[in-house]
């Protein structure tokens, strides 16, 4: 799986890049994807997205005025959805509630906490 990262006025600093790379490795370990994935980090909302959205093989994440921890949670949430649909072959469910959405919410929170325990040197940066 090849991961392509695009920054569109995201505000993510070079200092944060290494931290993001480690988080992507954790996501791939816990929820492995087979197909290539593009993640676009945005400084401004696109279309009707909330803080994140997913299309097949493409995730958009809003970064402006958000803590790194919140951005990570959104990335994880959408990554779990990508896994649900491409690996588990689940159908798209409701945006509010439902098995897919509830699992993505729960796993996203867990993945952020796992990352913080595994990389305590980044904990302070998570709140920037």
Language model region names:
Residues 1-13, 31, 37-46:
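Hydrophobic or amphipathic, alpha-helical segments that drive membrane association/targeting
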Residues 8-19, 97, 109:
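A short, highly charged nucleic-acid-interacting micro-segment common to nuclease
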Residues 13-35:
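Zn2+-dependent metallopeptidase catalytic core
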Residues 16-20, 72, 76, 100:
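Hydrophobic (often cysteine-bearing) scaffold residues that line and stabilize catalytic clefts
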Residues 33-69, 82, 86:
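Active-site scaffold of zinc-dependent metalloenzymes
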Residues 69-73, 85-114, 120-124:
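Post-HEXXH active-site segment of zinc metalloproteases
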Residues 77, 81:
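Histidine-centered divalent metal-coordination motifs
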Residues 126-128:
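Short acidic DE-rich linear segments
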